[in-house]
């Protein structure tokens, strides 16, 4: 997890609010602006970028799925609010039950709740049950929701012990009969289109969940390029008299890696701009082909960035495998 002082500084500087609408105290960031912010952070530290990515993303998605008056109460009365949630189900089947006062009780343990240590609220997924049977919606399907629970209604279970992204704090979150207050039961994390003009609020949810993850990957690749450049200029390989930077193979691979990074970044930005252009023209959703291109660009960018880090780590030789090497950290984070 991130140290408390780092999270506090990030909150103070508005990193968890920049994607919110201006009327809710944010900067109303576009998808391209979001990518740039997260990429910059990711070049420094991927776990910091990932925490900001999840916190700012869920803050912004939640505001689109709640009544604007309730949103003012949550976001403007507490400028330091940070949200988390949306992970997978744990080993115990989750459930939620309506209460007589209109609230909902929730039981369950969700996995991969990145940034939970920083959060004021958590969205916990569970089906709405009545006895042993699921409640059905108007479409005849079981009702499954992400229930919005305040911090005192859930606990963190320390399960995050991994190779890469170690600082993301993606532990489990558990609740045993936690209360989702009646005024929060109408909040829908996945509403589109939402109440706000920013095209981001009319993007299909799978795309909205994709481009900012790719931004973190871009940051890792960018940081790897910077780290390798420093290594190449200062490392003199065994049995050599000049630095690694003088070797043609190092120059070739550095050029190859930079071309991979810059080309996948450019395509991602191009496709996200095309999505926003369509939405600015008044469409409720982007066209199928535009969405397909953007989703493909997101996946392509993430995969190419992993290859960039692999290539540079390999070219750095034994220097890259040392635990003190920034390339070693980039390798684990990229994967």
What spans do the regions from the language model cover?
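Glycine-rich flavin
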Residues: 4-12, 17-119, 134-135, 141
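Residue-level signal for inorganic ion chemistry
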Residues: 10, 221, 264
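Active-site glycine-rich loop that binds ribose-phosphate moieties when present
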Residues: 87-90, 107, 126, 149-162
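DPxDG-like acidic metal-binding loop motif
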Residues: 109-153, 317
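Glycine-rich beta->alpha junctions and the first turn(s) of the following alpha-helix
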Residues: 163-261
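Generic structural signal for well-ordered, non-transmembrane alpha-helical segments
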Residues: 219, 255-262, 295, 299-306, ...
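C-terminal helix-coil-helix/basic helical segment that borders enzyme active sites and/or dimer interfaces
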Residues: 263-300, 313-316, 321
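Glycine-rich phosphate/cofactor-binding loops in nucleotide/flavin-utilizing enzymes
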Residues: 316-335
């Amino acid at each position: 997890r991130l140290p408390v002082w780092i999270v506090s500084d990030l909150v103070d500087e508005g990193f968890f609010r920049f994607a919110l609408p201006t009327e809710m105290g944010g900067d109303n960031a576009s998808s391209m602006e979001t990518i740039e912010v997260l990429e910059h952070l990711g070049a420094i530290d991927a776990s910091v970028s990932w925490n900001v990515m999840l916190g700012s993303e869920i803050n912004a998605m939640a505001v689109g799925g709640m009544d604007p008056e309730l949103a003012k109460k949550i976001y403007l009365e507490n400028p330091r609010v940070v949200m988390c949630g949306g992970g997978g189900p744990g080993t115990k089947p989750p459930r939620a039950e309506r209460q007589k006062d209109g609230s909902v009780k929730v039981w369950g343990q969700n996995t991969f709740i990145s940034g939970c240590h920083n959060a004021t609220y958590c969205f916990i997924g569970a089906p709405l049950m009545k006895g042993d049977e699921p409640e059905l919606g108007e479409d005849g399907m079981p009702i499954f929701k992400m229930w919005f629970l305040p911090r005192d209604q859930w606990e963190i279970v320390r399960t995050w012990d991994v190779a890469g992204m170690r600082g993301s704090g993606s532990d489990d979150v558990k609740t045993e009969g936690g209360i989702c207050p009646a005024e929060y039961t109408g909040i829908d994390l996945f509403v589109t289109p939402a109440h706000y003009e920013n095209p981001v609020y009319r993007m299909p949810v799978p795309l909205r969940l994709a481009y900012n993850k790719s931004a973190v990957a871009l940051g890792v690749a960018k940081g790897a390029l910077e780290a390798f450049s420093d290594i190449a200029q200062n490392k003199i390989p065994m049995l050599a008299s000049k630095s690694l930077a003088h070797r043609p193979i190092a120059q070739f691979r550095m050029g190859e890696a930079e071309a991979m990074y810059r080309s996948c970044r450019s395509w991602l930005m191009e496709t996200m701009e095309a999505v926003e252009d369509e939405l600015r023209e008044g469409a409720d959703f982007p066209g199928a082909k535009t969405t397909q291109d953007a989703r493909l660009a997101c996946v392509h960018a993430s995969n190419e960035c992993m290859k960039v880090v692999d290539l540079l780590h390999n070219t750095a030789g034994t220097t890259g495998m040392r635990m003190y090497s920034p390339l070693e950290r980039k390798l684990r984070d990229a994967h």
